[in-house]
Amino acid sequence: MADVTDSAFRQIISTCSPPDVFYTEFVSADGLCSEKGRPKLMPHLAFKENERPIVAQFFGANPENFYKCAQLAVELGFDGIDINMGCPAGKIVKHDSGAGLIRNPELAKEIIHETKRGAGGLPVSVKTRIGYNKIVTEEWISHLIEAEPDAIIIHGRTMKEMSKVPAHWDEIGKAAVLCRKAGVLIIGNGDIKTHAEGLEKAKQYGLDGVMVGRGVFSNPWFFNPSVDPATKTPEEKITLLKKHVKLFTELWGNNKHFDVMKKFFKVYISGWEGAKELRMELMKSKNKEDVAKLLIS
Protein backbone atom coordinates (compact mmCIF):
# COMPACT_ATOMS: atom_id res chain seq x y z
CA MET A 1 0.00 0.00 0.00
CA ALA A 2 1.40 3.36 -1.05
CA ASP A 3 2.56 5.54 1.87
CA VAL A 4 1.89 2.66 4.28
CA THR A 5 4.07 -0.40 3.74
CA ASP A 6 7.47 1.29 3.67
CA SER A 7 10.49 -0.12 5.47
CA ALA A 8 9.63 1.70 8.70
CA PHE A 9 6.17 0.09 8.83
CA ARG A 10 7.51 -3.32 7.85
CA GLN A 11 10.10 -3.21 10.62
CA ILE A 12 7.32 -2.50 13.12
CA ILE A 13 5.34 -5.47 11.80
CA SER A 14 8.45 -7.62 11.89
CA THR A 15 8.88 -6.73 15.56
CA CYS A 16 5.25 -7.44 16.47
CA SER A 17 4.27 -10.34 14.22
CA PRO A 18 6.31 -11.09 11.09
CA PRO A 19 4.38 -12.55 8.13
CA ASP A 20 5.73 -15.25 5.84
CA VAL A 21 6.59 -12.70 3.13
CA PHE A 22 6.80 -8.89 2.94
CA TYR A 23 6.04 -6.83 -0.18
CA THR A 24 7.31 -3.30 -0.74
CA GLU A 25 5.13 -0.38 -1.70
CA PHE A 26 4.62 -0.36 -5.46
CA VAL A 27 7.27 1.69 -7.23
CA SER A 28 7.14 3.18 -10.72
CA ALA A 29 9.25 1.18 -13.17
CA ASP A 30 9.36 4.20 -15.47
CA GLY A 31 10.53 6.45 -12.64
CA LEU A 32 13.26 4.03 -11.59
CA CYS A 33 14.54 3.96 -15.15
CA SER A 34 14.86 7.73 -15.41
CA GLU A 35 17.95 9.60 -14.27
CA LYS A 36 15.82 12.15 -12.43
CA GLY A 37 13.36 9.74 -10.87
CA ARG A 38 15.58 6.98 -9.51
CA PRO A 39 17.17 8.91 -6.60
CA LYS A 40 13.73 9.96 -5.35
CA LEU A 41 12.29 6.45 -5.60
CA MET A 42 15.12 4.35 -4.19
CA PRO A 43 14.06 4.87 -0.53
CA HIS A 44 10.83 3.05 -1.45
CA LEU A 45 12.98 -0.02 -2.12
CA ALA A 46 14.95 0.21 1.14
CA PHE A 47 14.74 -2.78 3.46
CA LYS A 48 16.48 -4.36 6.44
CA GLU A 49 17.42 -7.99 6.98
CA ASN A 50 14.59 -8.48 9.49
CA GLU A 51 12.12 -7.85 6.65
CA ARG A 52 13.09 -10.97 4.71
CA PRO A 53 11.84 -12.64 2.67
CA ILE A 54 10.89 -9.47 0.80
CA VAL A 55 9.47 -8.90 -2.67
CA ALA A 56 10.01 -5.74 -4.74
CA GLN A 57 6.76 -4.49 -6.30
CA PHE A 58 6.76 -2.46 -9.53
CA PHE A 59 4.09 -0.84 -11.69
CA GLY A 60 4.17 0.54 -15.21
CA ALA A 61 3.40 -0.29 -18.84
CA ASN A 62 6.84 -0.43 -20.49
CA PRO A 63 8.19 -4.01 -20.77
CA GLU A 64 11.78 -2.85 -21.25
CA ASN A 65 11.66 -0.91 -17.99
CA PHE A 66 10.37 -3.98 -16.16
CA TYR A 67 13.37 -5.89 -17.47
CA LYS A 68 15.67 -3.19 -16.08
CA CYS A 69 13.83 -3.06 -12.75
CA ALA A 70 14.03 -6.83 -12.41
CA GLN A 71 17.79 -6.55 -12.81
CA LEU A 72 17.80 -3.80 -10.18
CA ALA A 73 15.83 -6.00 -7.78
CA VAL A 74 18.43 -8.74 -8.20
CA GLU A 75 21.23 -6.24 -7.61
CA LEU A 76 19.55 -4.94 -4.44
CA GLY A 77 19.16 -8.45 -3.03
CA PHE A 78 15.38 -8.88 -3.12
CA ASP A 79 13.88 -12.34 -2.72
CA GLY A 80 11.24 -11.92 -5.42
CA ILE A 81 9.59 -9.49 -7.83
CA ASP A 82 5.92 -8.56 -8.08
CA ILE A 83 4.18 -6.83 -10.98
CA ASN A 84 1.26 -4.67 -9.88
CA MET A 85 -1.69 -5.17 -12.23
CA GLY A 86 -4.29 -4.33 -9.62
CA CYS A 87 -4.03 -0.70 -8.49
CA PRO A 88 -7.36 1.01 -9.36
CA ALA A 89 -6.20 4.64 -8.93
CA GLY A 90 -7.23 6.77 -11.89
CA LYS A 91 -3.80 8.35 -12.31
CA ILE A 92 -2.33 4.85 -12.63
CA VAL A 93 -4.85 3.08 -14.87
CA LYS A 94 -5.08 5.93 -17.38
CA HIS A 95 -1.51 5.09 -18.38
CA ASP A 96 -2.35 1.36 -18.80
CA SER A 97 -0.55 0.61 -15.53
CA GLY A 98 -1.90 -1.21 -12.50
CA ALA A 99 -5.41 -2.52 -13.16
CA GLY A 100 -5.27 -0.79 -16.54
CA LEU A 101 -3.29 -3.78 -17.82
CA ILE A 102 -6.40 -5.95 -17.46
CA ARG A 103 -7.62 -4.22 -20.63
CA ASN A 104 -4.41 -5.13 -22.45
CA PRO A 105 -3.59 -8.80 -21.85
CA GLU A 106 -0.93 -9.00 -24.56
CA LEU A 107 1.02 -6.12 -23.02
CA ALA A 108 0.55 -7.73 -19.60
CA LYS A 109 2.08 -10.97 -20.86
CA GLU A 110 4.98 -9.15 -22.48
CA ILE A 111 5.69 -7.38 -19.17
CA ILE A 112 5.74 -10.73 -17.35
CA HIS A 113 8.12 -12.21 -19.93
CA GLU A 114 10.52 -9.25 -19.71
CA THR A 115 10.43 -9.24 -15.91
CA LYS A 116 11.27 -12.94 -15.83
CA ARG A 117 14.08 -12.36 -18.34
CA GLY A 118 15.69 -9.82 -16.03
CA ALA A 119 14.92 -11.59 -12.77
CA GLY A 120 17.91 -13.93 -12.77
CA GLY A 121 15.84 -16.81 -11.45
CA LEU A 122 14.00 -14.85 -8.75
CA PRO A 123 10.31 -15.76 -8.52
CA VAL A 124 8.00 -13.35 -10.35
CA SER A 125 4.41 -12.80 -9.22
CA VAL A 126 1.50 -10.72 -10.48
CA LYS A 127 -0.93 -8.88 -8.21
CA THR A 128 -4.21 -8.21 -9.96
CA ARG A 129 -8.02 -8.08 -9.80
CA ILE A 130 -10.93 -10.12 -11.15
CA GLY A 131 -11.67 -7.63 -13.93
CA TYR A 132 -11.75 -4.01 -15.04
CA ASN A 133 -15.35 -2.80 -15.44
CA LYS A 134 -16.83 -6.28 -15.17
CA ILE A 135 -15.81 -9.65 -13.76
CA VAL A 136 -13.69 -11.65 -16.23
CA THR A 137 -11.78 -13.80 -13.77
CA GLU A 138 -11.28 -16.97 -15.78
CA GLU A 139 -10.51 -15.24 -19.08
CA TRP A 140 -8.02 -12.83 -17.48
CA ILE A 141 -6.28 -15.37 -15.26
CA SER A 142 -5.95 -17.73 -18.24
CA HIS A 143 -4.11 -14.98 -20.14
CA LEU A 144 -1.73 -14.44 -17.23
CA ILE A 145 -1.05 -18.15 -16.83
CA GLU A 146 0.13 -18.28 -20.46
CA ALA A 147 3.07 -16.06 -19.45
CA GLU A 148 4.01 -18.52 -16.67
CA PRO A 149 4.36 -16.30 -13.60
CA ASP A 150 5.43 -18.12 -10.47
CA ALA A 151 2.44 -16.83 -8.52
CA ILE A 152 -0.74 -14.81 -8.97
CA ILE A 153 -2.16 -12.71 -6.16
CA ILE A 154 -5.77 -11.90 -6.92
CA HIS A 155 -7.91 -9.26 -5.23
CA GLY A 156 -11.58 -10.19 -5.28
CA ARG A 157 -12.96 -7.00 -6.81
CA THR A 158 -12.93 -5.34 -10.22
CA MET A 159 -11.15 -2.06 -10.83
CA LYS A 160 -14.53 -0.32 -11.03
CA GLU A 161 -15.61 -1.71 -7.67
CA MET A 162 -12.50 -0.30 -5.94
CA SER A 163 -13.17 -1.28 -2.30
CA LYS A 164 -16.85 -0.33 -2.32
CA VAL A 165 -18.32 -3.85 -2.27
CA PRO A 166 -17.41 -7.06 -0.43
CA ALA A 167 -14.68 -9.09 -2.11
CA HIS A 168 -15.95 -11.85 -4.42
CA TRP A 169 -14.20 -14.82 -2.89
CA ASP A 170 -16.06 -17.22 -5.17
CA GLU A 171 -14.18 -15.60 -8.07
CA ILE A 172 -10.89 -16.04 -6.23
CA GLY A 173 -11.85 -19.71 -5.95
CA LYS A 174 -12.30 -19.90 -9.74
CA ALA A 175 -8.84 -18.42 -10.23
CA ALA A 176 -7.44 -20.99 -7.79
CA VAL A 177 -8.77 -23.88 -9.89
CA LEU A 178 -7.04 -22.55 -13.01
CA CYS A 179 -3.77 -21.85 -11.20
CA ARG A 180 -3.61 -25.25 -9.55
CA LYS A 181 -4.03 -26.95 -12.93
CA ALA A 182 -1.20 -24.84 -14.35
CA GLY A 183 1.13 -25.25 -11.37
CA VAL A 184 1.02 -21.53 -10.55
CA LEU A 185 0.83 -20.50 -6.90
CA ILE A 186 -2.40 -18.66 -6.07
CA ILE A 187 -2.84 -16.14 -3.25
CA GLY A 188 -6.16 -14.49 -2.37
CA ASN A 189 -6.72 -10.95 -1.14
CA GLY A 190 -9.66 -8.93 0.08
CA ASP A 191 -11.41 -8.14 3.37
CA ILE A 192 -9.30 -10.42 5.58
CA LYS A 193 -9.85 -9.04 9.07
CA THR A 194 -8.24 -11.70 11.27
CA HIS A 195 -5.48 -14.30 11.11
CA ALA A 196 -8.02 -17.08 11.59
CA GLU A 197 -10.17 -15.78 8.74
CA GLY A 198 -7.16 -15.80 6.45
CA LEU A 199 -6.41 -19.44 7.23
CA GLU A 200 -10.07 -20.32 6.76
CA LYS A 201 -10.24 -18.64 3.35
CA ALA A 202 -7.04 -20.36 2.20
CA LYS A 203 -8.45 -23.76 3.13
CA GLN A 204 -11.95 -23.10 1.78
CA TYR A 205 -10.80 -21.92 -1.65
CA GLY A 206 -7.73 -24.10 -2.09
CA LEU A 207 -5.21 -21.27 -1.93
CA ASP A 208 -1.48 -21.31 -1.31
CA GLY A 209 -1.85 -18.26 0.90
CA VAL A 210 -3.60 -14.96 1.50
CA MET A 211 -2.29 -11.42 1.28
CA VAL A 212 -3.37 -8.94 3.93
CA GLY A 213 -3.48 -5.18 3.42
CA ARG A 214 -5.81 -3.01 5.46
CA GLY A 215 -6.15 -5.67 8.16
CA VAL A 216 -2.53 -5.35 9.24
CA PHE A 217 -2.55 -1.57 8.90
CA SER A 218 -4.85 -1.31 11.93
CA ASN A 219 -3.26 -4.17 13.89
CA PRO A 220 0.55 -4.62 13.98
CA TRP A 221 0.04 -7.94 15.82
CA PHE A 222 -2.15 -9.37 13.04
CA PHE A 223 0.16 -12.28 12.20
CA ASN A 224 0.42 -13.44 15.82
CA PRO A 225 -3.03 -14.80 16.71
CA SER A 226 -1.98 -15.37 20.32
CA VAL A 227 -1.81 -11.59 20.87
CA ASP A 228 -4.96 -9.59 21.52
CA PRO A 229 -4.28 -5.92 20.68
CA ALA A 230 -6.85 -4.92 23.28
CA THR A 231 -4.55 -6.25 26.01
CA LYS A 232 -1.69 -3.96 25.01
CA THR A 233 -1.07 -1.23 27.59
CA PRO A 234 -0.87 2.47 26.69
CA GLU A 235 2.83 2.35 27.57
CA GLU A 236 3.46 -0.51 25.12
CA LYS A 237 1.58 1.26 22.33
CA ILE A 238 3.36 4.56 22.94
CA THR A 239 6.75 2.82 22.90
CA LEU A 240 5.84 1.29 19.55
CA LEU A 241 4.72 4.66 18.18
CA LYS A 242 8.01 6.25 19.24
CA LYS A 243 9.90 3.52 17.42
CA HIS A 244 7.78 3.95 14.29
CA VAL A 245 8.32 7.72 14.24
CA LYS A 246 12.08 7.20 14.66
CA LEU A 247 12.23 4.69 11.81
CA PHE A 248 10.06 6.88 9.57
CA THR A 249 12.30 9.89 10.15
CA GLU A 250 15.50 7.90 9.57
CA LEU A 251 14.12 6.51 6.32
CA TRP A 252 12.61 9.65 4.83
CA GLY A 253 14.20 12.66 6.54
CA ASN A 254 12.68 15.69 4.83
CA ASN A 255 11.88 13.76 1.64
CA LYS A 256 8.37 12.82 2.77
CA HIS A 257 5.90 15.07 4.56
CA PHE A 258 5.43 14.16 8.22
CA ASP A 259 1.65 14.14 7.70
CA VAL A 260 2.08 10.71 6.11
CA MET A 261 3.14 9.38 9.51
CA LYS A 262 0.01 10.75 11.15
CA LYS A 263 -2.26 8.14 9.57
CA PHE A 264 -0.71 5.65 12.01
CA PHE A 265 -1.44 7.62 15.18
CA LYS A 266 -4.86 6.03 15.72
CA VAL A 267 -3.29 2.57 15.53
CA TYR A 268 -1.19 3.31 18.60
CA ILE A 269 -3.12 6.00 20.46
CA SER A 270 -6.52 4.46 21.12
CA GLY A 271 -8.27 2.23 23.59
CA TRP A 272 -7.82 4.15 26.83
CA GLU A 273 -9.23 7.20 28.56
CA GLY A 274 -7.62 10.35 27.22
CA ALA A 275 -6.30 8.67 24.06
CA LYS A 276 -8.53 10.70 21.76
CA GLU A 277 -7.39 13.99 23.28
CA LEU A 278 -3.73 12.97 23.03
CA ARG A 279 -4.24 11.91 19.44
CA MET A 280 -5.77 15.27 18.55
CA GLU A 281 -2.70 17.02 19.96
CA LEU A 282 -0.38 14.65 18.10
CA MET A 283 -2.13 15.51 14.84
CA LYS A 284 -0.75 19.03 15.21
CA SER A 285 2.85 17.77 15.30
CA LYS A 286 5.23 18.64 12.48
CA ASN A 287 8.13 16.31 13.25
CA LYS A 288 9.45 13.66 15.62
CA GLU A 289 10.55 16.30 18.13
CA ASP A 290 6.97 17.55 18.48
CA VAL A 291 5.79 13.98 18.99
CA ALA A 292 8.47 13.34 21.62
CA LYS A 293 7.47 16.44 23.61
CA LEU A 294 3.81 15.40 23.69
CA LEU A 295 4.54 11.82 24.67
CA ILE A 296 6.86 12.90 27.48
CA SER A 297 4.31 15.33 28.86
Identify the function of each model-found stretch:
Residues 37-38, 43-47, 90-101:
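An active-site metal/cofactor-coordinating segment within enzyme catalytic domains
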Residues 60, 102, 106, 166, ...:
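Conserved phosphate-coordination/catalytic loops
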Residues 11-16, 67-81, 85-95, 106-186:
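Alpha/beta enzyme core
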Residues 2, 8, 110-113, 137-151, ...:
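Alpha/beta catalytic cores of nucleotide-metabolism and tRNA/nucleoside-modifying enzymes
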Residues 22-23, 55-57, 82, 153, ...:
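Conserved beta-strand positions in the central sheet of alpha/beta enzyme cores
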